Protein backbone atom coordinates (compact mmCIF):
# COMPACT_ATOMS: atom_id res chain seq x y z
CA UNK A 1 0.00 0.00 0.00
CA UNK A 2 1.12 3.53 -0.79
CA UNK A 3 -0.14 7.02 -0.10
CA UNK A 4 -0.85 7.46 -3.80
CA UNK A 5 -3.15 4.41 -3.74
CA UNK A 6 -5.59 6.06 -1.33
CA UNK A 7 -8.67 6.91 -3.42
CA UNK A 8 -10.10 9.59 -1.13
CA UNK A 9 -8.85 13.11 -0.43
CA UNK A 10 -6.62 13.17 2.65
CA UNK A 11 -6.62 16.21 4.97
CA UNK A 12 -3.97 15.09 7.44
CA UNK A 13 -1.22 12.48 7.54
CA UNK A 14 0.33 11.13 10.75
CA UNK A 15 3.89 9.87 10.25
CA UNK A 16 5.51 7.51 12.75
CA UNK A 17 8.12 5.72 10.61
CA UNK A 18 11.93 5.80 11.19
CA UNK A 19 13.52 9.19 10.58
CA UNK A 20 15.54 8.08 7.55
CA UNK A 21 12.34 7.34 5.59
CA UNK A 22 10.53 10.58 6.46
CA UNK A 23 11.82 12.67 3.48
CA UNK A 24 10.33 10.21 1.00
CA UNK A 25 7.11 9.98 3.00
CA UNK A 26 6.73 13.76 2.85
CA UNK A 27 7.33 13.75 -0.89
CA UNK A 28 4.60 11.13 -1.24
CA UNK A 29 2.23 13.29 0.83
CA UNK A 30 2.98 16.33 -1.31
CA UNK A 31 2.37 14.36 -4.50
CA UNK A 32 -0.98 13.20 -3.09
CA UNK A 33 -1.93 16.78 -2.23
CA UNK A 34 -2.00 16.27 1.53
CA UNK A 35 -1.67 19.75 3.09
CA UNK A 36 -0.80 18.87 6.70
CA UNK A 37 1.32 16.34 8.60
CA UNK A 38 1.81 15.38 12.24
CA UNK A 39 5.40 14.14 12.34
CA UNK A 40 5.68 11.97 15.45
CA UNK A 41 8.94 10.31 14.34
CA UNK A 42 12.04 11.12 16.41
CA UNK A 43 15.72 10.92 15.50
CA UNK A 44 16.23 14.46 14.26
CA UNK A 45 17.84 17.58 15.75
CA UNK A 46 17.45 16.29 19.29
CA UNK A 47 20.01 13.52 18.50
CA UNK A 48 22.84 15.74 17.25
CA UNK A 49 24.41 17.16 14.09
CA UNK A 50 23.41 14.34 11.74
CA UNK A 51 19.82 14.50 12.88
CA UNK A 52 19.83 18.29 12.47
CA UNK A 53 20.84 17.90 8.82
CA UNK A 54 18.00 15.44 8.25
CA UNK A 55 15.53 17.77 9.96
CA UNK A 56 16.60 20.66 7.74
CA UNK A 57 16.06 18.48 4.67
CA UNK A 58 12.59 17.49 5.85
CA UNK A 59 11.66 21.14 6.40
CA UNK A 60 13.04 22.10 2.99
CA UNK A 61 10.92 19.43 1.30
CA UNK A 62 7.79 20.46 3.19
CA UNK A 63 8.21 24.18 2.56
CA UNK A 64 8.96 23.71 -1.13
CA UNK A 65 5.89 21.50 -1.51
CA UNK A 66 3.52 23.82 0.36
CA UNK A 67 3.02 21.31 3.17
CA UNK A 68 2.66 22.33 6.82
CA UNK A 69 3.85 19.98 9.55
CA UNK A 70 4.14 19.92 13.31
CA UNK A 71 7.13 18.18 14.88
CA UNK A 72 9.20 16.15 14.47
CA UNK A 73 9.62 14.37 17.79
CA UNK A 74 6.09 15.28 18.87
CA UNK A 75 3.46 13.32 20.77
CA UNK A 76 0.80 14.69 18.40
CA UNK A 77 -2.33 16.84 18.48
CA UNK A 78 -5.89 16.69 19.83
CA UNK A 79 -9.00 18.66 18.88
CA UNK A 80 -12.03 17.62 20.89
CA UNK A 81 -14.12 20.17 18.98
CA UNK A 82 -13.04 18.56 15.70
CA UNK A 83 -13.28 15.00 17.07
CA UNK A 84 -9.61 14.46 16.22
CA UNK A 85 -7.07 12.52 18.27
CA UNK A 86 -3.76 12.21 16.42
CA UNK A 87 -1.36 11.24 19.17
CA UNK A 88 0.73 8.24 20.15
CA UNK A 89 -1.30 7.19 23.20
CA UNK A 90 -5.01 6.36 23.72
CA UNK A 91 -6.23 9.41 25.60
CA UNK A 92 -9.53 11.23 25.12
CA UNK A 93 -10.15 14.41 27.15
CA UNK A 94 -13.57 15.93 27.62
CA UNK A 95 -14.36 18.94 25.39
CA UNK A 96 -13.62 22.33 26.90
CA UNK A 97 -12.39 25.87 26.36
CA UNK A 98 -8.72 25.29 27.23
CA UNK A 99 -5.95 25.01 24.63
CA UNK A 100 -2.67 23.40 25.71
CA UNK A 101 0.62 23.94 23.89
CA UNK A 102 3.47 21.80 25.19
CA UNK A 103 7.09 21.40 24.12
CA UNK A 104 7.17 18.19 26.17
CA UNK A 105 4.93 15.39 24.98
CA UNK A 106 5.15 13.42 28.21
CA UNK A 107 4.27 16.41 30.36
CA UNK A 108 1.48 17.36 27.98
CA UNK A 109 -0.05 13.90 28.29
CA UNK A 110 0.27 14.06 32.07
CA UNK A 111 -1.58 17.38 32.17
CA UNK A 112 -4.38 15.97 30.03
CA UNK A 113 -4.63 12.91 32.29
CA UNK A 114 -4.99 15.25 35.27
CA UNK A 115 -7.67 17.20 33.41
CA UNK A 116 -9.62 14.00 32.72
CA UNK A 117 -9.30 12.85 36.33
CA UNK A 118 -10.48 16.23 37.65
CA UNK A 119 -13.32 16.63 35.16
CA UNK A 120 -11.70 19.60 33.39
CA UNK A 121 -12.36 20.12 29.69
CA UNK A 122 -9.66 20.48 27.03
CA UNK A 123 -10.53 21.83 23.60
CA UNK A 124 -7.15 21.54 21.93
CA UNK A 125 -3.73 20.04 22.61
CA UNK A 126 -0.61 20.51 20.49
CA UNK A 127 2.75 18.93 21.23
CA UNK A 128 5.22 21.01 19.26
CA UNK A 129 8.23 18.68 19.40
CA UNK A 130 11.33 20.14 17.75
CA UNK A 131 9.35 22.96 16.11
CA UNK A 132 11.22 22.59 12.84
CA UNK A 133 8.45 24.40 10.96
CA UNK A 134 5.45 25.25 13.15
CA UNK A 135 6.49 27.08 16.32
CA UNK A 136 4.77 27.44 19.68
CA UNK A 137 4.09 31.08 18.80
CA UNK A 138 2.27 30.02 15.60
CA UNK A 139 -0.07 27.83 17.61
CA UNK A 140 -0.50 30.56 20.22
CA UNK A 141 -1.52 32.98 17.47
CA UNK A 142 -3.95 30.42 16.05
CA UNK A 143 -5.61 29.68 19.38
CA UNK A 144 -5.86 33.41 19.95
CA UNK A 145 -8.28 33.58 17.01
CA UNK A 146 -10.43 30.59 17.97
CA UNK A 147 -13.66 31.62 19.71
CA UNK A 148 -13.89 28.19 21.41
CA UNK A 149 -10.65 28.90 23.29
CA UNK A 150 -11.05 30.94 26.48
CA UNK A 151 -7.52 30.39 27.88
CA UNK A 152 -4.18 28.97 26.73
CA UNK A 153 -1.77 26.86 28.81
CA UNK A 154 1.82 26.95 27.56
CA UNK A 155 4.70 24.68 28.61
CA UNK A 156 7.97 26.06 27.30
CA UNK A 157 11.48 24.68 27.16
CA UNK A 158 12.73 27.50 24.93
CA UNK A 159 11.98 29.71 21.92
CA UNK A 160 14.12 30.45 18.88
CA UNK A 161 12.91 34.02 18.34
CA UNK A 162 12.12 35.93 21.52
CA UNK A 163 10.92 39.08 19.75
CA UNK A 164 8.47 37.21 17.53
CA UNK A 165 7.16 35.25 20.51
CA UNK A 166 6.70 38.47 22.50
CA UNK A 167 4.76 40.16 19.70
CA UNK A 168 2.46 37.17 19.35
CA UNK A 169 1.92 36.82 23.09
CA UNK A 170 1.10 40.51 23.53
CA UNK A 171 -1.53 40.30 20.81
CA UNK A 172 -3.18 37.22 22.31
CA UNK A 173 -3.15 38.34 25.96
CA UNK A 174 -5.16 41.43 25.02
CA UNK A 175 -8.20 39.21 24.47
CA UNK A 176 -7.64 36.01 26.46
CA UNK A 177 -5.40 34.80 29.32
CA UNK A 178 -2.20 32.88 28.62
CA UNK A 179 -0.58 30.87 31.43
CA UNK A 180 3.01 29.63 31.06
CA UNK A 181 5.33 27.21 32.81
CA UNK A 182 9.00 27.60 31.86
CA UNK A 183 11.33 24.69 32.49
CA UNK A 184 15.05 25.03 33.14
CA UNK A 185 14.94 26.96 36.39
CA UNK A 186 18.00 25.00 37.54
CA UNK A 187 21.15 24.29 35.52
CA UNK A 188 20.19 20.61 35.36
CA UNK A 189 16.69 21.40 34.13
CA UNK A 190 18.03 23.76 31.48
CA UNK A 191 20.41 21.10 30.17
CA UNK A 192 17.66 18.47 30.11
CA UNK A 193 15.35 20.76 28.13
CA UNK A 194 17.99 21.43 25.50
CA UNK A 195 18.83 17.74 25.07
CA UNK A 196 15.14 16.80 24.83
CA UNK A 197 14.06 18.91 21.86
CA UNK A 198 17.23 20.68 20.80
CA UNK A 199 15.78 24.00 21.98
CA UNK A 200 17.72 26.95 23.33
CA UNK A 201 16.56 27.12 26.93
CA UNK A 202 17.92 30.60 27.72
CA UNK A 203 17.97 32.34 31.08
CA UNK A 204 15.02 31.59 33.36
CA UNK A 205 15.08 35.18 34.62
CA UNK A 206 14.98 36.45 31.03
CA UNK A 207 11.90 34.39 30.28
CA UNK A 208 10.22 35.56 33.48
CA UNK A 209 10.77 39.17 32.45
CA UNK A 210 9.51 38.41 28.94
CA UNK A 211 6.35 36.81 30.30
CA UNK A 212 5.65 39.82 32.52
CA UNK A 213 6.09 42.27 29.65
CA UNK A 214 3.86 40.19 27.38
CA UNK A 215 1.06 39.88 29.93
CA UNK A 216 1.56 36.14 30.43
CA UNK A 217 0.72 34.62 33.81
CA UNK A 218 3.72 32.57 34.97
CA UNK A 219 3.34 29.52 37.22
CA UNK A 220 5.88 27.26 38.90
CA UNK A 221 4.52 23.70 38.63
CA UNK A 222 2.61 21.57 36.09
CA UNK A 223 -0.38 21.28 38.44
CA UNK A 224 -0.52 25.07 38.73
CA UNK A 225 -0.41 25.33 34.94
CA UNK A 226 -3.55 23.22 34.64
CA UNK A 227 -5.40 24.61 37.65
CA UNK A 228 -4.87 28.28 36.82
CA UNK A 229 -5.50 28.02 33.08
CA UNK A 230 -8.57 25.80 33.52
CA UNK A 231 -10.03 28.19 36.11
CA UNK A 232 -9.53 31.12 33.75
CA UNK A 233 -11.71 29.45 31.10
CA UNK A 234 -14.67 30.09 33.44
CA UNK A 235 -13.83 33.67 34.40
CA UNK A 236 -14.46 36.93 32.52
CA UNK A 237 -11.54 39.04 31.33
CA UNK A 238 -10.84 41.85 33.87
CA UNK A 239 -11.86 45.27 32.59
CA UNK A 240 -9.11 47.12 34.49
CA UNK A 241 -6.41 46.70 37.13
CA UNK A 242 -8.52 48.27 39.89
CA UNK A 243 -8.72 45.16 42.08
CA UNK A 244 -8.74 45.16 45.88
CA UNK A 245 -8.14 42.18 48.18
CA UNK A 246 -9.68 41.82 51.65
CA UNK A 247 -8.36 39.15 54.01
CA UNK A 248 -9.30 38.00 57.52
CA UNK A 249 -5.67 37.35 58.47
CA UNK A 250 -2.43 39.24 58.16
CA UNK A 251 -0.25 36.20 57.45
Regions found by a protein language model. Name each.
Residues 1-251:
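Catalytic-core regions of core metabolic enzymes
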Amino acid sequence: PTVAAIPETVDLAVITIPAAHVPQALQDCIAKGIPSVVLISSGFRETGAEGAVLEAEVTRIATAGGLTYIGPNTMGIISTHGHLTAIGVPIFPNPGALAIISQSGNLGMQIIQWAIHRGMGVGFYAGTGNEAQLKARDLLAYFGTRPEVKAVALYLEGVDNGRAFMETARAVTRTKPVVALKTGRSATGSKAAQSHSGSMAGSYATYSAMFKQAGIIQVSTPSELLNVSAALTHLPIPRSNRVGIMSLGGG
